């Protein structure tokens, strides 16, 4: 008698927004895969589509709503999760439901179990005798949506700050730090799985453990405080045997950050800090209600460079914030020239529904905001170009991201100064030695021979 083979249900997934949302998507897919669901790369090939949305700025809202519409048109069965799922429309009801009433379910961010329940309701899980007996078939690290050689490690969720331009706390809640043992176990599993670069992310990495009063956890039989310094020390120790990188993102410039600079200076973790400064003028920072707004950031950056001359600092800024005067904006330009931020991005301020900054008097015309953003980026690019030119002639370690024909025709990679997707790259020319090969996910030494925009040109050695 022929058995009727059960059709394996297939899930489509679109992940929009920041790396923190990406880690939520990875967790959802890991749990679904552990239950026997398969994934589809197309809407048409899926039995159901999950859209993980972003709702931070208006452009992100539009992109998320458009993507939901595309998924509905192509597939018809759509579950929505993420930050936009927590957003209300003009009449107070759920915005996604207003715009797309036919979606199957809507949840807010980091609502993994609610998404799982919605999937089970609309696409019952398959019975797989093997998977059913394996409670964690994909290991601690789970499924990753990044290339195999790098991964994001989320250490906390939410944020305790109430910056006037930001609505993330209203969508993701207050700070909740992951247990330090869980974080370190995931890190080790990722390294064991071949990850060569770990990118530590959260809404506020410097505040890790504040919510639990830095309580002591345990990992590998040893006590470890739930605090940024101890976490970074442990990550560096775990990474060392694998020759892997640890890169820190979203690090607010608190005095405690000084404690991790020796770890960077001695090579335990990458000498790279992603510090969201947003502005330099004290009055603008006060209107933004930025944490650490009273800190002397210029002095702090100078001290960091004294402690670790190789440090690369990335930051983001807002131009044209409500009430920003020309003098306040010039203060920001002077700060950029003096601080010499290695990698900088800038947004022209735009009103975000639900943000208290909307009530601050002095909204600037769009043309002024865009013009200031352009002026800022001209200064930032000049600083970056000068910094990049200083690397010409140096030999650097490069993590290979792309290497067709074993790299004999060249490829692309990144140095310690380049985070994936947001910074420049190292464009690798064909090696001088015919015997030299390169593989994706491996390190190579390369001599910097030129600069092209935000990128370096290098010859593998």
Curated annotation (Swiss-Prot):
Transmembrane segments: none annotated. Its EC number is 2.8.4.4. [4Fe-4S] cluster 1 binds at residues 18, 54, 83. SUPFAM superfamilies: Radical SAM enzymes (SSF102114). Coiled coil: none annotated. GO terms for cellular component: cytosol. This is Ribosomal protein uS12 methylthiotransferase RimO. The keyword S-adenosyl-L-methionine applies. Its main location: cytoplasm. It is found in: Cytoplasm. SMART domains: Elp3. Residues 389-461 form the TRAM domain. It comes from Polaromonas naphthalenivorans (strain CJ2). Catalyzes the methylthiolation of an aspartic acid residue of ribosomal protein uS12.
